[in-house]
């Protein structure tokens, strides 16, 4: 490698001198590594535009530092994009913006109040009220609940049947009401007795003979309960979820605000430059693996094969989800295995230069409590990996990805088992279990719509778990069988377990929005 770099370094030094710049050997080596994949003609073109960019920076001295080179390369890679627009970004869950619904103007407004892990006691109810407000406003817009209008001389009663949403206080103020529909939190205030609760009160439910719609109805989720109310009890005929809403319809109530997170002040979903890049970059892929046990030698060998195989065609990112070791307390063991992970890519120079390696911890990985959002693996444990693979990024769980205009949520959680253990009614059609799973989180607009005892969340950072507006792709790292399902323009993908599924993983192709099933085969003897 050094032999190849030597003439290129000389070429860089001479070109910079002709333009009035001086460059140190370590900086010329850095630039040579960036230009090495190109042929001679392309290298000359890049050198020309880089020196022109450096001249436009109006440096204070003729000495070109590493920061100036990186700025020039980044700006040239973003030609055609506006300020703040990035092709690919990892978004920390603790930086996701929080919005509150303003009932008066019927819009979501950015909440700029500071947030903290040990927050005020009032947030225990406030975060659930905000989740309720989000579901209420989209439910009231749905065709089944929106006020009827006269169209072409046809009266409201001749059109499709409409429902009027009732609040708990409306039912509690009367002794009987037929065909009542209530939106609220499904909760068990007394043992064996379930209630639907909203900010105005709670109503006891009689679920005997109730017809359950598709999905997992767990305590802690929001439901639409339809039935006849009499003497303080709602005899439920049907129990369903709040209706899902396409992302395009939801975004209209946020204006141009960046609801996704990241550095851009506006939402990148409508960027013409990024849309064009997304369309033309047909070879770009993102690789997802879950349950990557670095303490198992066979897993390390399969990862080595994966890295070597992708070195000739590097993906945009490789996302590895935990647990990374069996031990939850031995921090030194995890550091040792992360160092070894960096060593696996020792000969994969193109992969390390062009691919982001993203590590998403599970609840079993050390240093953070089992509460969502979960903090990333500490940098001190991944120092060796960060040195060996500089493009490594330590992510929160969950985290968000932005590729061009596409929005991707990544979460490592065994959620299917939690749903199955806590649901009031198990779906009868078990062959479509993945459809029930996808419908539950899409309709709830939340990653973990279950009781806080089953999955605690940080109250102040609950918006990081929202799925509203719906993203393009939700990637769950669940150890159950892999699947994918599309709901209202959103694809829900479960990667399955890398260890338990004969080393299978998923490859997402953003240009076509398709998912490929891949597997690392046994090497031929």
Curated annotation (Swiss-Prot):
Belongs to the DNA polymerase epsilon subunit B family. The gene is PolE2. It comes from Drosophila melanogaster. This is DNA polymerase epsilon subunit 2. The keyword Ribonucleoprotein does not apply. InterPro entries: DNA_pol_a/d/e_bsu, DNA_pol_e_bsu_N, POLE2. Component of the epsilon DNA polymerase complex consisting of four subunits: the catalytic subunit PolE1/DNApol-epsilon255 and the accessory subunits PolE2/DNApol-epsilon58, Chrac-14/DNApolE3 and PolE4. It is found in: Nucleus. The lineage of its organism: Eukaryota, Metazoa, Ecdysozoa, Arthropoda, Hexapoda. GO terms for biological process: DNA endoreduplication; DNA replication proofreading; DNA-templated DNA replication; error-prone translesion synthesis; mitotic DNA replication; positive regulation of cell cycle process; positive regulation of DNA endoreduplication. Keywords: DNA replication, DNA-binding, Nucleus. GO terms for cellular component: epsilon DNA polymerase complex. Disruption phenotype: Pupal lethal. Results in smaller eye, leg and wing disk, brain lobe and salivary glands. Results in defective entry and/or progression though S phase during the cell cycle in eye imaginal disk cells. Results in defective endoreplication in salivary glands. Accessory component of the DNA polymerase epsilon complex. Participates in DNA repair and in chromosomal DNA replication. Has a role in the entrance and progression through S phase. Has a role in endoreplication. Essential for viability and tissue development.
């Amino acid at each position: 490698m050094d032999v190849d770099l030597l003439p290129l370094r000389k070429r860089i030094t001479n070109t910079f001198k002709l333009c009035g710049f001086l460059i140190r050997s370590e900086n010329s080596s850095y630039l040579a590594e960036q230009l090495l994949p190109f042929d001679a003609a392309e290298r000359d073109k890049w050198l020309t535009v880089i020196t022109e960019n450096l001249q436009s920076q109006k440096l204070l001295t003729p000495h070109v530092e590493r920061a100036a080179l990186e700025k020039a390369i980044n700006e040239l890679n973003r030609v055609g994009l506006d300020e703040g627009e990035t092709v690919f970004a990892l978004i920390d869950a603790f930086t996701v913006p929080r919005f509150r619904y303003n009932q008066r103007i019927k819009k979501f407004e950015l909440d700029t109040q500071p947030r903290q892990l040990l927050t005020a006691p009032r947030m225990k109810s406030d975060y659930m009220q905000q989740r309720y407000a989000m579901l209420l406003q989209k439910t009231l817009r749905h065709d089944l609940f929106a006020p009827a209008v006269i169209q072409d001389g046809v009266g409201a009663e001749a059109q499709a049947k409409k429902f009027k949403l009732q609040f708990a206080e409306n039912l509690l103020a009367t002794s009987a009401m037929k065909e009542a529909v209530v939106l609220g939190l499904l909760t068990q205030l007394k043992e064996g007795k379930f209630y639907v609760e909203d900010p105005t009160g709670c109503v006891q439910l009689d679920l005997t003979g109730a017809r359950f719609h598709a999905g997992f109805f767990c305590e802690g989720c929001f439901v639409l309960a339809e039935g006849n109310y009499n003497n303080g009890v709602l005899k439920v005929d049907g129990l369903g979820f709040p209706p899902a809403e396409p992302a395009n319809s939801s975004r209209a109530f946020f204006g141009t605000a960046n609801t996704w997170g990241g550095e851009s002040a506006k939402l990148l979903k409508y960027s013409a430059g990024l849309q064009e890049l997304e369309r033309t970059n047909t070879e770009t892929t993102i690789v997802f693996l879950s349950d990557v046990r670095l303490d198992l030698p066979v897993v390390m060998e399969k990862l080595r094969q994966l890295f070597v195989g992708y070195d000739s065609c590097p993906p945009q990112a490789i996302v590895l989800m935990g647990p990374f070791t069996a031990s939850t307390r031995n921090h030194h063991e995890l550091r040792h295995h992360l160092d070894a992970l960096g060593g696996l890519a020792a000969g994969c120079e193109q992969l390390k230069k062009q691919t982001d390696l993203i590590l998403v911890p599970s609840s079993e990985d050390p240093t953070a409590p089992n509460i969502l959002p979960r903090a990333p693996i500490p940098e001190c444990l991944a120092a060796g990996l960060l040195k060996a693979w500089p493009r490594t990024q330590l992510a929160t769980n969950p985290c968000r990805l932005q590729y061009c205009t596409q929005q991707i949520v990544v979460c490592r959680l065994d959620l299917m088992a939690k749903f199955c253990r806590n649901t009031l009614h198990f779906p009868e059609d078990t062959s479509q279990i993945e459809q029930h799973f996808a419908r539950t989180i899409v309709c709830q607009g939340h990653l973990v719509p279950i009781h806080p005892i089953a999955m605690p969340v940080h109250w102040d950072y609950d918006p990081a778990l929202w799925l509203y507006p719906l993203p393009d792709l939700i990637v769950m790292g669940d150890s159950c069988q892999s699947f994918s399902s599309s709901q209202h323009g959103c694809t829900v993908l479960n990667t399955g377990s890398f260890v338990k599924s004969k080393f299978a993983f998923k490859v997402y192709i953003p240009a076509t929005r398709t998912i490929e099933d891949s597997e690392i085969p046994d090497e031929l003897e």
